[in-house]
Amino acid sequence: MSIEELARDNVRRLTPYQSARRLGGNGDVWLNANEFPTAVTFDLSQQTLNRYPECQPKAVIENYAQYAGVKPEQVLVSRGADEGIELLIRAFCEPGKDAVLYCQPTYGMYSVSAETFGVECRNVLSLDDWQLDLPAIADNLDGVKVVFVCSPNNPTGQIINPQDVRTLLEMTRGKALVVADEAYIEFCPQATLTGWLEEYPHLVVLRTLSKAFALAGLRCGFTLANKDVIDLLMKVIAPYPLSTPVADIAAQALAPQGINAMRERVAQILVERQYLVNALKDIACVEQVFDSETNYILARFTASSAVFKSLWDQGIILRDQNKQPSLSGCLRITVGTREESQRVIDALKAEQV
């Protein structure tokens, strides 16, 4: 028996998530992973690397709870929000029996995580405006334990209608969790659903330090939920999910000075986003620029594959969305520095279409 044959059937069939780094490239303008364009620095204050870290570092939990407006017992910290996705599926879904549901086009890790654990995936396509198709969701809820809703949605950039999410929460009460992925909520904080946690005990909110906090390399995310949900997740999380340096930096990033710095970064990105949107609308190969509430822009291009390859060859790395349902011809562009935006604009203007 070969090593391949020893592996689980579903793992042999699995197509891994194609992260920005996995796709590679030799660029000097990286606009494919929705990272903050410049680095932030911190001084490490904890020098106890000979000891194992806390499972849930107190300073990180308390600082995030204060920032998010929830109780500390409603917060779980993990290795990025991606680990939160995995924990929810592991804790609530029986392999071979239960299902998760999501609405494409959306973030790809919901399906990859479910498939890894042998849990059925149900994809209910979004409406033409990328909002929830509530009747279709209702028709597909049997056996579903977790519904993932990305808002603002990656890669389309729009907020999911809050009233539709409320309808979904009523529809799933006593049947399934509704997980609102708010990875990009710092760019539109008025749209957060954290204020609904008391009203809906089956609501879960995912957050991250990877985007507006400019700490994608830290791998630190949060799950906000009813205490009963957090207690169950604590049963399946690894004993030491955060290293001591990660917890040290996260606590600093979530202190008042760190929060203020994050909000200044958001204001900077919003200015740069508008600059890039205005320029894209006047470029010949750009057919449509979609509204965005995030730090990235989705646009539809004439000959998008050729445009993508041309910019790639010039060291400008964007994210190709052609394989996502309803996103034919679309590329996603992270909002970077003014210099990076200008590189994109100049390269696109030079395209012959």
From Swiss-Prot:
Q: What class of enzyme is it?
A: transferase
**Modification sites for N6-(pyridoxal phosphate)lysine:** 211
Name any cofactors this protein relies on: pyridoxal 5'-phosphate
Q: Molecular function terms in GO for this entry?
A: histidinol-phosphate transaminase activity; pyridoxal phosphate binding
| Pathway it works in | Amino-acid biosynthesis; L-histidine biosynthesis; L-histidine from 5-phospho-alpha-D-ribose 1-diphosphate: step 7/9
Q: Could you tell me the superkingdom of the organism this chain comes from?
A: Bacteria
Specify whether Amino-acid biosynthesis is a keyword of the entry.
yes
Q: Which InterPro entries match?
A: Aminotrans_II_pyridoxalP_BS, Aminotransferase_I/II_large, HisP_aminotrans, PyrdxlP-dep_Trfase, PyrdxlP-dep_Trfase_major, PyrdxlP-dep_Trfase_small
Cystines in this chain: none
The question of whether Transferase is a record keyword is answered with yes
Recorded catalytic activity of this chain's protein: L-histidinol phosphate + 2-oxoglutarate = 3-(imidazol-4-yl)-2-oxopropyl phosphate + L-glutamate
Q: Which UniProt keywords apply?
A: Amino-acid biosynthesis, Aminotransferase, Histidine biosynthesis, Pyridoxal phosphate, Transferase
The biological processes this protein is annotated with in GO are: L-histidine biosynthetic process
SUPFAM superfamilies annotated for this entry?
PLP-dependent transferases
Q: What Enzyme Commission number(s) apply to this enzyme?
A: 2.6.1.9
Q: Which family does it belong to?
A: Belongs to the class-II pyridoxal-phosphate-dependent aminotransferase family. Histidinol-phosphate aminotransferase subfamily.
Subunit and interaction comment: Homodimer.
Tell me what this protein is called: Histidinol-phosphate aminotransferase
The protein's gene is named hisC
